[in-house]
């Protein structure tokens, strides 16, 4: 972009003449920080919501998927972007409404997410027939439906809080797989998933995503990939590296892999089909309720 001016340098307490490099928006910088600068890789940035981002060497137009945007990360490639409005926020909702007081009494609040993983791990894949629709704040992809609502169905007297939590983990994973299926239908096939954000701390949640999607998941040494991606932009901008792919090869390090467990494929496939059907079965009811309330789910 240029160099830091004397006035800006004075305001910031820096030296005039420092190179100023243009970066990018947070999610796109995360793609760079995860080394998702090659076809068939998908970046999954998991926080309160989840962004799903990929690069294609040709434009792909897919209903419910944002883009294609040419040149936003690499000049000769197109970004495809999907997303879920509620993922980590649903887990936080469960924590705040079902567990907060109990864990405060035990003085274990700082470890509550580890405890939640242990709780959910007690339940078998498929949550004994319990399903969660993750549209707690509407559906971003692939339906673009702000009137959609969340749902918990299949409850019986044998189900517990742990079942509901496990079903939330699985329901959000079904939502991610729905986006992957939408992309695949229109010509983009993800072969690897790279994750960042607070949600990447839950190995159980990531394992469920890998099992449902039947795709390996990779973790990197830097949890906040957007920050690393911005540093990579700067490194290329000042000439340390000749290109973004060259820089990511040197600066992004893989810290772990999570591979799909094939024994869970059939059971998750069955419940995924019910997940997709549930939206269409409930769509009119969700819209009527949202319209009657006169509001869309809070963002």
Task: Go through each PLM region and give its residues.
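Active-site core segments that coordinate phosphate-bearing ligands/cofactors
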Residues: 2-299
């Amino acid at each position: 972009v240029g160099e830091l001016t004397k006035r800006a340098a004075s305001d910031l307490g820096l030296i005039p003449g420092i190179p100023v490099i243009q970066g990018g928006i947070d999610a796109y910088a995360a793609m760079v920080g995860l080394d998702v600068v090659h076809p068939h890789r998908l970046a999954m940035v998991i926080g309160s919501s989840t962004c799903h981002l990929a690069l294609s060497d040709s434009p792909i137009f897919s209903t419910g998927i944002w883009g294609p945007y040419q040149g936003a990360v690499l000049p000769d490639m197109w970004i495809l972007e999907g997303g879920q409005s509620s993922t980590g926020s649903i887990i936080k909702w469960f924590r705040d409404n079902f567990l907060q007081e109990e864990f405060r009494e035990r003085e274990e609040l700082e470890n509550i997410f580890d405890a939640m993983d242990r709780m959910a791990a007690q339940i078998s894949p498929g949550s004994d027939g319990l399903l969660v629709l993750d549209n707690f704040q509407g559906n971003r992809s692939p339906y673009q439906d702000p009137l959609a609502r969340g749902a918990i169905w299949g409850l019986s007297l044998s189900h517990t809080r742990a079942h509901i939590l496990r079903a939330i983990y699985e329901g959000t994973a079904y939502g991610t797989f729905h986006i992957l299926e939408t992309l695949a239908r229109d010509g983009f096939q993800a072969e690897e998933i790279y994750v960042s954000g607070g949600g990447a701390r839950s190995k159980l949640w990531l394992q469920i995503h890998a099992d449902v999607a039947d795709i390996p998941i990779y973790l990197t040494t830097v949890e906040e990939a957007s920050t690393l991606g911005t540093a990579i932009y700067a490194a290329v901008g000042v000439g340390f590296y000749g290109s973004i792919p060259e820089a990511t090869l040197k600066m992004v390090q893989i810290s772990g892999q999570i591979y799909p467990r094939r024994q869970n494929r059939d059971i998750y496939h069955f419940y995924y089909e019910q997940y997709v059907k549930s939206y269409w079965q409930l769509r009119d009811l969700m819209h009527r309720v949202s319209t009657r309330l006169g509001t869309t789910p809070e963002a």
